[in-house]
Amino acid sequence: MLQENAPAESESDTNSTPARAAWSTENVNVETRALLDRDSNAFLHQSVSTPCLTAIKKAEGIYIEDVGGRRYIDFHGNNVHHIGYGHPRLKRAISEQMDALPFAPRRFTCEPAVQLAEKLAAITPGNLSKVLFTTGGSDAIEVAIKVARAATGRFKTLSFWDAFHGAGFGAASVGGEALFRGKPHGPLMPGAEHVAPFGSFNCPYGGRNAQESGDACARMIDYVLTREGDFAAFIAEPIRAVPYVPPPGFWRKVREACDRTGTLLIFDEIPTGLGKTGRMFSCEHDGVTPDILVLGKGLGGGILPIAAAVCRPELDVGGAWAFGHYTHEKNPVTTRAALETIQIIEDEGLVENAARVGQCALERLESWKDRFTEVVDVRGRGFLMGIELAGNDDKRPAKAIAERTLYNALENGLSFKTTMGNVLTLTPPLVTSQAQMDQALDILETALAAARNA
């Protein structure tokens, strides 16, 4: 029997609030309602999924279009739409590969799979050069945990509360969101320990600013790793996708603590890798190379699911065992899609675009602090941005205003998500132009103004 009071959703907007019901009543037509009802009858219900918001029939470039004909700029996209939806080059490459070689069964390799592994070794930082492919980021996290256990002879992990690393059993265990590890899931993976994350506003360590928070968090990680001394890995996103930007020196301190205690450092770049933060990999901002780097989401170009764990060669110690023997591990179509996606990102200068347009966007968002007292923090890098809303006097999260802003924006053609209930989180495709960004922020500014005055 499940508890009646479910945990507050932190991964995205809720699907059971009065605001969602009101939006559906006013914005869902008869045709869409029929499809939503069929969806509700066919799928298991779960938070932030079924029951769904609406139904879409088209996705192209930075836009999605619902069954009723409303078009949205998609600044959510589950972080898969780096090159925009339906990129012509990607669709052509997939079609060609399906004609040439649609599948590679177990025991066989193929040219696209090897090329992708070599490409990832070439573009990832440091000497990361040994790869395993999976069909999703959660599975790639599982592979990373297994490799870390095998290489160190240890089983314990350390990670952040409030982090998301996937919905699989091991990934949910190292994650820190109640939605994915709460009461109905039962006992999770043994040895998965957590510390409070760094922050800036309402820091769990009591820091007055981002630097103080980061310093306190780094000391706590150092303390736990040293005190127990037997962790296989510390697992984290190099920039928390809420988002929170690590203060200068934070990851160098963590890297030093890991090295001193024999703990492997695993960076989860599933949402941030391949240019999202204005660098090919988010960890490059901080000059720290992990022992294992995990990729997913945008790697398949927003069409096909593929993820990867990229490791130091010294971690290739389990040749007699199976760490990631997946049916589609070396699928020629998904690996060809990933190769083409990376090539498009490089050819079209999309990493540089995210850095340039993202910086302009962050400067504009920062100016909102002067207009909106509820905007207490603006943070991000490149095309990963967060606007935190809270009461000006009591600093309590302004969740109602955030939710109203979300639905106001949807009504006017902008889709994004809220995280932790009060952070407006924008993750645009890397192909977003300055003009498109300006249009999206115009919609968001109007939506926020209306929400706070409601």
Language model feature labels by segment:
Residues 2-454:
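Conserved N-terminal phosphate-binding loop of PLP-dependent enzymes in the Aspartate aminotransferase
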